[in-house]
């Protein structure tokens, strides 16, 4: 998502991507946050497919928006390959994409065909020891801390010994891979083995964090990770002295607020909580 609230997630998820679709509104054009997400994708070495979307709008100006998009790529120092981006015109609401503004507008096949043609599969080695970069994390009442990432090399098997190392190569945690899940659409499906290239959810390490490398015990070199931009806003929470204090909401005590903030910081890498 382009919204700034999801900036931290966008940065992390890019490390799992082989390609990207840059969606631009055909009427509104390039938005401030478009520059942010595109700059991150370009730095990651991705070669985006530009999709001028919402051509069903009466005030669409697709050709002008395409020029604005090219200028944006140039301003972000895109290389020659990235500047030679393919373009499609689409309406997500109507369910079609075409190579031309006035194309037949039948279905999304042109987009799917272009993804297959333009996005090359990653060359990953399944014979090396297991290693993956922890990209996202969340707490589960049943599994405990769960880590999401793409397996960079090797295979992961349930119950195998694993460890977590930070960006400096220091061991953060060690344990057993208790559960592995793979995503099928939005559903998590338990599996026994995950292979290089799979995006998986693993459980078994309670101290591991985002940007740590989850790996076999013999692996000592961390996977490089892109540093997250630090939070740009600081909030101090104090006692509510308003005459209306205590009349709204159910969680009113400082302890309840603290517990909720701690929980959020465990799941959201864009938040830092101190007390």
Region locations from a protein language model:
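Structural and coupling elements of P-loop NTPases
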Residues: 1-275
